[in-house]
UniProtKB/Swiss-Prot annotation:
This is Transcriptional regulatory protein QseB. PROSITE patterns: OMPR_PHOB, RESPONSE_REGULATORY. It is found in: Cytoplasm. Phosphorylated by QseC. The modification 4-aspartylphosphate is found at D51. Keywords: Cytoplasm, DNA-binding, Phosphoprotein, Transcription, Transcription regulation, Two-component regulatory system. Residues 124-218 bind DNA. Transmembrane segments: none annotated. Member of a two-component regulatory system QseB/QseC. Residues 2-116 form the Response regulatory domain. The keyword DNA-binding applies. One of its GO terms (cellular component) is protein-DNA complex. CDD domains: REC_OmpR_PmrA-like, trans_reg_C.
Length: 221
């Protein structure tokens, strides 16, 4: 899943980018409010981690402008502003969650996963589809109650398909969702990952919708 991170503290921002990437997220990091606000429309982000005390444009103003422009991406405020009034104001301005610094990386990741699941209509960390069970907390996959070994890329690709079980995904949208600006997924690599998933989960589990992209097997053209 692709995350937009707006944080001006280099130590915190670098730690979040590295840590969340290791946990399977693709992370684009910006250090000021003005650039971060503009970045939201540049890629299909699944969620935003937003600091409030930012140079050039305050994080609360960034959030308010997004919401006034009908940008509905889930936003997790991550800030040192910890008073009750500030937390209430952040949530009333359109934030979906609010977490105060200092924080634990595991909690940030768990909150992001919960926000993204809700966006796609799921309320549990275990997603099941056609005999395949994906556990986001354990990052494990089971087929007919048997564990399946996947690479990190294969897991992220499978997670994307299962969260979008009723949608056809184009090649470009898959590549954008799974990579940050600091990395790219080549078209050939995507073909290899899809081939490997079909070998492990069944050839019909991921269907090619000719001229459009890919979908889980039960999705109609």
């Amino acid at each position: 899943m692709r995350i937009l991170l707006i944080e001006d503290d280099n130590l915190i921002g670098n730690g979040l980018q590295i840590g969340l990437t290791k946990l399977g997220f693709a992370v684009d990091w910006f250090t000021d409010g003005k650039t971060g606000m503009a970045a939201l429309t540049s890629a299909p982000y699944d969620a935003v981690v937003l600091d409030l005390t930012l140079p050039k444009l305050d994080g609360l103003e960034v959030l308010q402008q997004w919401r006034s422009n009908h940008q509905d991406v889930p936003v997790l405020i991550l800030t040192a502003r910890d008073t009750l009034d500030e937390r209430v104001k952040g949530l009333q301005s359109g934030a979906d969650d609010y977490l105060c610094k200092p924080f634990a990386l595991a909690e940030v990741a768990a909150r992001l996963q919960a926000l993204i699941r809700r966006r796609y209509g799921y309320h549990h960390s275990v997603i099941e589809q056609a005999g395949v069970k994906l556990d986001q907390n354990q990052r494990s996959v089971w087929l007919n109650n048997q564990p399946i070994s996947l690479t990190s890329r294969e897991y992220k690709l499978l997670e994307l398909f299962m969260l979008n079980k009723d949608r056809v995904l184009s090649r470009s949208s898959i590549e954008e969702k799974l990579s940050s600006w600091d990395e790219e997924i080549s078209s050939g690599a995507l073909d290899v990952h899809i081939y490997n998933l079909r070998q492990k989960l069944g050839k019909q589990f991921i269907r090619t919708v000719h001229g459009v992209g890919y979908a889980l097997g039960q999705v109609e053209k």
